[in-house]
């Protein structure tokens, strides 16, 4: 192994470890490694504790297979229960770090400036808006896999081995979330630019097969879900607020700014962004124009379609503004930064352009890094397991509550009702007093004691 390759491997390992650690340490209060989040424990860990990997892989949750979450949760179930929070969070953070490394290598095929490649790479684990809801959460890895799929499609490898690896990435992404289909337009750019167009068609073809499997599962085994009605006219405003304005302010300032200026500011920001994007698209070279255009198209689609399916209720509340639903903005924001990087990639002086972008994003990251998240208030997994152990040792154990969310969602849902030798361990978010329990891990006392 020559020195260059050795340095590359060493730098890659160092980055993955650093990016993983940063995600685990993000936010105030309790850290991600001591809090089990919602479906991570209430669905996927419960499944892994009760069924085989194959059973879990073919059982949908919330309308899709969520393969990546189940691949992580299954080995976690074999560990001591007290390790579950740390193992789930570390697994999720490691996957995100590896995706960022993949982006670094693929982006070199379409971006020339080192700062542009650093931007689209570092924003994966450090995205300011990821801290509130999706940081180090197994349940939300499918958003990051969609971003990975975008990159392997827009910048396809030229070797057979590279195509095999890319096919594995898009298959995992598509089998985790059917919405990954929204990044398929990137394949057009990748195929047109590739000197080996037939080979470049392999990865999109594999993705279509995986999406067909997801479609069959969704049609035959999934139940529909809608949180609210969809008002189509609100979707542009939601994109302007939660993506464009959020990209300028970060999460911590978004609420105060929106409450102060309302949709008028959102409209102004949207109009200015459209004018600037049009000018930069006109000035950009062919590669930058293609990558930026497909990035913007996929960014808008990845907000409009998921939110349209979920319902638009709550996103534009001004007086009681909330960051709830920020998971729907992760892919749109990541792809928006791809467009920014592609449009500014060739501008000179590159050092100045890259420095301005780096300072701008660094201020956001530092501002949002300590912002509260859905995990900040716990409950602490270590403390909860200790309480469960004490409850299992008590001579008279009170009846245990049954979580409302089943381990298997959809038409084949199987609610978990605690047995006489089971204990219920509540996970985040804890419901308000008087509200039914949503998410919990139901574990046998024999496993809790062990």
Where do the language-model regions lie?
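Transmembrane alpha-helix segments characteristic
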Residues: 17, 285-316
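Alpha-helical transmembrane segments in multipass membrane proteins, preferentially the mid-helix core
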Residues: 153-158, 187, 275-281, 334-346
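Intrinsically disordered, polar/acidic, low-complexity terminal segments
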Residues: 2-50, 54-131, 160-161, 189-191, ...
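Membrane-interface transmembrane helices that cradle and orient dolichyl/undecaprenyl
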Residues: 149-165
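Multi-pass, polyprenyl lipid-linked donor-dependent membrane glycosyltransferases
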Residues: 130-149
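Hydrophobic/aromatic-rich transmembrane helices and adjacent perimembrane loops
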Residues: 141-143, 316-345
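Transmembrane helices and adjacent periplasmic/lumenal helix-loop junctions
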Residues: 168-189
């Amino acid at each position: 192994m020559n020195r260059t390759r050795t340095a590359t491997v060493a730098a890659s390992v160092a980055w993955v470890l650093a990016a993983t650690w940063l995600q685990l340490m993000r936010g105030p209060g309790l850290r991600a490694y001591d809090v089990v989040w919602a479906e991570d424990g209430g669905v996927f860990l419960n499944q892994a504790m009760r069924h085989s990997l194959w059973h879990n892989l073919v059982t949908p949750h919330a309308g899709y297979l969520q393969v990546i979450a189940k691949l992580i949760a299954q080995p976690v179930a074999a560990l001591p229960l007290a390790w579950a929070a740390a193992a789930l969070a570390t697994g999720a953070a490691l996957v995100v770090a590896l995706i960022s490394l993949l982006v670094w290598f693929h982006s070199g095929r379409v971006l020339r400036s080192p700062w542009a490649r650093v931007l689209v790479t570092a924003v994966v684990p450090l995205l300011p808006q990821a801290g509130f809801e999706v940081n180090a959460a197994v349940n939300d890895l499918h958003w990051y896999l969609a971003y990975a799929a975008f990159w392997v499609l827009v910048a396809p490898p030229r070797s057979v081995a590279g195509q095999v690896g890319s096919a594995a990435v898009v298959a995992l992404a598509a089998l985790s979330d059917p919405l990954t289909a929204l990044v398929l337009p990137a394949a057009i750019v990748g195929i047109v630019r590739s000197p080996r167009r037939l080979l470049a068609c392999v990865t999109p073809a594999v993705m279509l097969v995986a999406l067909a499997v997801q479609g069959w599962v969704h049609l035959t085994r999934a139940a529909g879900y809608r949180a609210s009605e969809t008002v189509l006219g609100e979707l542009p405003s939601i994109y302007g607020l939660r993506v464009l304005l959020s990209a300028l302010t970060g999460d911590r300032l978004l609420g105060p700014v929106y409450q102060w200026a309302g949709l008028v500011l959102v409209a102004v920001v949207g109009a200015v962004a459209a004018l600037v994007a049009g000018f930069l698209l006109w000035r950009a070279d062919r590669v930058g124009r293609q990558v930026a255009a497909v990035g913007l198209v996929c960014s808008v689609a990845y907000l409009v379609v998921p939110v349209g399916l979920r319902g638009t209720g709550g996103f534009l509340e001004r007086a009681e503004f909330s960051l709830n639903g920020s998971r729907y903005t992760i892919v749109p924001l990541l792809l928006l930064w791809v467009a920014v990087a592609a449009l500014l990639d060739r501008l000179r002086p590159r050092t100045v352009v890259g420095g301005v972008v780096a300072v701008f994003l660094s201020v956001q990251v530092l501002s949002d890094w300590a912002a509260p998240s859905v995990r900040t208030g716990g409950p602490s997994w270590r403390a909860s397991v200790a309480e469960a152990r004490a409850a299992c040792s008590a001579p008279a154990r009170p009846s245990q509550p049954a979580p409302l969310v089943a381990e298997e969602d959809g038409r084949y849902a199987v609610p978990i009702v605690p047995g006489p030798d089971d204990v219920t361990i509540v996970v985040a978010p804890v419901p308000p007093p008087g509200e039914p329990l949503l998410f919990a891990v139901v574990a046998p006392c024999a496993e809790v004691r062990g």
